[in-house]
């Protein structure tokens, strides 16, 4: 295997895994390999999930073939069987600028709209779904379909509805057609920043404790109690601040349910008071003796 083919194979394998990963896959496409030993030929089911589209509900089979120098050359895309669409040839080949090689003298398409190595399989498939819903009638591949689309829209819609119903027989056994709601949820998960997911699980995110730029804990003004720098806690929690020598400073909360640990030992208090009581009694005796002598 040549180095270029090996590069293409590795790239396609990675993109195939991403597009078939349940967590990352786009609901509009069902993708399988024609042969498990050949990464260069993909069988694809194209679905339009927009409920307002006349193509909604269809499962349009297609095949994608990749050249050995991919991504430097574009893949080929063909609907199998062909569908009635202004930009689909009667043999099923798709006429779309993103799959045309740049610099082709047979077309007048600007290079910005043609194939480039930065394109991916995903970007191509998304462009195809967009073209299904919004045909380019200025460059038709099927003239009859283009005329119907422009001059006989109702006739065109009826023809497409027939295509949609016919395509349903190609839905793989056991495959559940996605809905527009599932597509929205899937896209929302992809768009959700990882920081937001982590933030939802972060205890301190909704706390009154903030971090400064150095990661140290800062106490807000309303955290202090009458100027004593004491943070009140409920349920007699004990607030300990450990000023360790290392860079990690921790705040520890200890729930002490044993009253003996938090309460004052009455016996020890009485013991501390006993000397004062003895001194008071001694002074009283001396006063009595002095009075007796005077009498």
From Swiss-Prot:
Its EC number is 2.3.2.23. One of its GO terms (molecular function) is ubiquitin conjugating enzyme activity. Gene3D superfamilies: Ubiquitin Conjugating Enzyme. PROSITE patterns: UBC_1, UBC_2. GO terms for biological process: cell division; cellular response to methylmercury; DNA replication; G1/S transition of mitotic cell cycle; G2/M transition of mitotic cell cycle; mitochondrial fusion; mitotic intra-S DNA damage checkpoint signaling; positive regulation of D-glucose transmembrane transport. Residues 189-200, 269-279 have a biased composition (Basic and acidic residues). GO terms for cellular component: chromosome, telomeric region; cytoplasm; nucleus; SCF ubiquitin ligase complex. Keywords: ATP-binding, Cell cycle, Cell division, Cytoplasm, DNA replication, Nucleotide-binding, Nucleus, Phosphoprotein, Transferase, Ubl conjugation pathway. Residues 7-169 form the UBC core domain. The modification Phosphoserine is found at residues 186, 282, 292. It catalyses: S-ubiquitinyl-[E1 ubiquitin-activating enzyme]-L-cysteine + [E2 ubiquitin-conjugating enzyme]-L-cysteine = [E1 ubiquitin-activating enzyme]-L-cysteine + S-ubiquitinyl-[E2 ubiquitin-conjugating enzyme]-L-cysteine. SMART domains: UBCc. The acidic C-terminal extension is essential for the cell cycle function. Present with 8170 molecules/cell in log phase SD medium. Catalyzes the covalent attachment of ubiquitin to other proteins. Capable, in vitro, to ubiquitinate histone H2A. Mediates the initiation of DNA replication (transition of G1 to S phase in cell cycle). Essential component of the E3 ubiquitin ligase complex SCF (SKP1-CUL1-F-box protein), which mediates the ubiquitination and subsequent proteasomal degradation of target proteins. Involved in the regulation of methionine biosynthesis genes and in the degradation of CDC6 together with CDC4 and CDC53. Interacts with CDC53. Component of the E3 ubiquitin ligase complexes SCF with CDC53, SKP1/CBF3D, HRT1 and some F-box proteins like MET30 and CDC4. This is Ubiquitin-conjugating enzyme E2-34 kDa. It comes from Saccharomyces cerevisiae (strain ATCC 204508 / S288c) (Baker's yeast).
